[in-house]
């Protein structure tokens, strides 16, 4: 039974999709069959894996509203052991439609259930909001990974996010847990960065990944080439950071790399 992890932050520009794409790719490279589920209407995880988000055909929108099973939407990527459930702009209207459907909080959970036996890890790239689609994701997953940028206002909205996770845990998904908090856009030369690190560790004791994701131009460039950074520039700082994050993530889950890229 594969583990499901939602990558969530209700604020854009924090490295959410970058983390979803590159962590999923790195885990696949280490020998584990991995699925990335793009449920962000912007579809940047979809394009970041080399697909045209304007021409995906069926998408996670169809899966969520019940027009097509997940198996029909599934796409193999050209990257090692990594598959994708793509998104497109149709998702932008899904919140309104889902609100009127039966079992509205469990649409994603029920849709992904047949795939959990086929994958070791399933990562969900959530919308940058705490709407009904994100609530659906939280109801469907085992854990939540929260990226936080090392910048001013880094903790903005975190209390609201944690409150939402607690409500979902109480009402719908009692087993959900915090997988970890990931510090992104890290620049150790800045005093502000050190202040943010201290604040985050105080807010999330024992939950902050030891690996940090640095500011890195290759991380910014890779999506425009439709590639995870490890395939775009294996030697870059960004690639090495996500490689190390995958190792730490696997260790937390009692796993070791089965192969090396």
Regions found by a protein language model. Give the residues of each.
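P-loop NTP-binding core
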Residues: 1-261
């Amino acid at each position: 039974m594969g583990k499901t992890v939602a990558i969530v932050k209700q604020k854009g520009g924090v490295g959410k999709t970058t983390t979803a794409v590159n962590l999923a790719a790195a885990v696949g490279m280490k020998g584990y069959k991995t699925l990335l589920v793009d449920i962000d209407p912007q579809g940047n995880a979809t394009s970041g894996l080399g697909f045209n988000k304007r021409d995906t055909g069926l998408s996670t929108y169809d899966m969520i509203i019940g027009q097509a099973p997940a198996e029909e939407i599934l796409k193999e990527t050209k990257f090692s052991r990594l598959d994708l459930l793509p998104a497109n702009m149709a998702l932008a209207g899904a919140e309104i439609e889902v609100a009127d459907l039966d079992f509205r909080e469990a649409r994603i959970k029920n849709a992904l259930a047949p795939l959990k036996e086929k994958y070791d890890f399933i990562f969900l790239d959530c919308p940058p909001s705490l709407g009904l689609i994100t609530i659906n994701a939280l109801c469907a997953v085992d854990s939540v990974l929260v990226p936080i940028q090392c910048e001013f206002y880094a903790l903005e909205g975190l209390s609201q996010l944690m409150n939402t996770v607690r409500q979902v845990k109480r009402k719908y998904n009692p087993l959900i847990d915090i997988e970890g908090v990931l510090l992104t856009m890290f620049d150790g030369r800045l005093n502000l960065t050190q202040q943010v690190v201290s604040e985050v560790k105080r807010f999330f004791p024992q939950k902050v990944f030891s690996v940090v994701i640095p500011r890195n131009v290759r991380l910014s460039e890779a999506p425009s080439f439709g590639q995870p950074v490890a395939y775009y520039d294996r030697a870059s700082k960004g690639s090495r950071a996500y490689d190390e994050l995958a190792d730490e993530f696997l260790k937390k889950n009692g796993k070791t790399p089965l192969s090396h890229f």
